[in-house]
Design a protein with these regions (language model features):
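Function-determining surface determinants
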Residues: 1-221
Length: 221
């Protein structure tokens, strides 16, 4: 949040630095307190316990990445959830709705990344667009937290800060809505058909290259 505050000041030169510095000091104190809580032995033990349990669970999971039907089923569900959330994202949406959209976009981004090396140029571009979208929504989330810190402070300087936050969040959310409409334009079934065609094209090229690869020296004729 401290970095977001500095970025906000950089974009809004008319904000008084004296008021901003007082807010920055409060944020640094809160951040330090949070770090101390995370560093406490009980917190570390809990993190290690959860991480260990998750690792044990993942080691039991074996997914055949060549099983397109299995991958397609998961991708379709992830895409459908994201499409529904972004289509419902309206101007002035509540923080929870924006956060759920960000989570859905990240799920799709990671899922598409798992398709490498078969990912086409278009899929890679989609991943980059999703990355920018999640960055925008991540900044919006940080600004929402910053705004909640300022909410109970009533002097003029903090009021100006909150107005600047509101303007920036409106811009970020507007950009996210437009990006979401483009990225989730297709219906889920059409989107999976689109991915399947690209996957099939990649498989044809891959198999041809494998057939044309020179045999290793000493291999049986």
């Amino acid at each position: 949040m401290h970095d977001r505050l500095l970025e906000l000041v950089e974009e809004n030169r008319r904000l008084s630095t004296s008021g901003v510095f007082s807010v920055a000091e409060r944020l640094e104190i809160k951040q330090q307190q949070a770090l101390e809580q995370m560093s406490a032995p009980s917190a570390r033990d809990e993190i290690e316990r959860v991480a260990g349990a998750l690792q044990d669970h993942l080691e039991c999971v074996r997914v055949d990445t060549d099983d397109w039907e299995l991958l397609a089923c998961g991708l379709k569900r992830i895409y459908r959830v994201g499409r529904r959330r972004f289509r419902a994202l309206k101007k002035g949406a509540d923080d929870d709705s924006v956060h759920r959209c960000r989570k859905a976009a990240k799920d799709l981004m990671y899922s598409l990344q798992s398709l490498t090396p078969m990912a086409s140029g278009q899929i890679k571009r989609t991943v980059r667009q999703l990355h920018r979208l999640t960055d925008d929504l991540g900044e919006d989330h940080d600004l929402a937290l910053l705004d909640s810190t300022l909410r109970d402070i009533g002097d003029r300087q903090q009021s100006k800060l909150r107005k600047a936050i509101k303007r920036r969040r409106a811009k970020l959310q507007r950009r996210a809505r437009h990006a979401g409409r483009r990225l989730y334009e297709r219906k889920p079934r059409r989107y999976l058909r689109h991915l399947g065609l690209r996957r099939n094209a990649w498989m044809v090229v891959h198999e041809r290259l494998m057939r044309e690869r020179p045999a290793p020296e000493g291999a049986a004729a």
